[in-house]
């Protein structure tokens, strides 16, 4: 209902999607957006003066964003499991290794406490960690595609009036649990 009301009261457009919202923010046409570290390089290129903060509460409760986690795995069939383990433990998952990854794509908040302490000097990272602490780990499973598709359909159906919010969410729950 919250999103339906935002559209109804003309705070957001009914046809806004990620790419439209990101482009509008990067052009300075939108006052705020909810995004993550993956978007920072584009914002920086746009020369937008921005900050990152704790997501607002909703009905007095902290927001619970999905939290993505960068992982590394070793194929069970690998003939070099020991070498791969050594690389991960002694090179990649170190302050220096994560710093190299972070130079390529911002990691946001990280689980390695020593590197997180270095990153937390950046207020964007500190806020990202605060949000992650309140959040829920997003499973990296194929069923998440069904979740996102059903959720998108529910939002579109509710904001266009094709369904009530309750009916749209019930349909989404049915699709997700099939």
Give short role names for the model-derived ranges:
Residues 2, 150-161:
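Solvent-exposed, amphipathic alpha-helical segments
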Residues 19, 78-82, 141-149, 163-166:
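Soluble non-cytosolic domains of exported or imported proteins
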Residues 25, 165-176:
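Short, well-structured alpha-helical segments that form the helix of a local strand-helix-strand
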Residues 1, 57-65, 114-120:
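Short, solvent-exposed loop/beta-turn-alpha elements that line the ligand-binding surface or hinge
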Residues 1-43, 82, 168:
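Extracytoplasmic ligand-binding clamshell segments of periplasmic binding protein
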Residues 5-12, 44-105, 160-163:
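Extracytoplasmic/periplasmic substrate-recognition and gating elements
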Residues 53, 101-150, 157:
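Long, aromatic- and glycine/proline-rich binding clefts that accommodate carbohydrate-like moieties
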């Amino acid at each position: 209902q919250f999103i339906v009301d935002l559209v109804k009261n003309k705070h957001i457009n009914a046809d806004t999607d990620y790419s439209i919202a990101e482009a509008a923010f990067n052009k300075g046409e939108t006052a705020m957006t909810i995004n993550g570290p993956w978007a920072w390089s584009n914002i920086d290129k746009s020369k937008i003066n921005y900050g990152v903060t704790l997501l607002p509460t909703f009905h007095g409760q902290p927001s619970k964003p999905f939290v993505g986690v960068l992982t590394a795995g070793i194929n069970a069939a690998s003939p070099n499991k020991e070498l791969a383990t050594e690389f991960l433990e002694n090179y990649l998952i170190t302050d220096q290794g994560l710093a190299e990854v972070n130079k390529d794509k911002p990691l946001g908040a990280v689980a390695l406490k020593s590197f997180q302490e270095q990153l937390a000097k950046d207020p964007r990272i500190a806020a990202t960690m605060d949000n992650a602490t309140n959040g829920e780990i997003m499973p990296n499973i194929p069923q998440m595609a069904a979740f996102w598709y059903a959720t998108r359909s529910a939002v579109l159906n509710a904001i266009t009036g094709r369904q009530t919010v309750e009916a749209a969410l019930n349909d989404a729950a049915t699709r997700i649990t099939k």
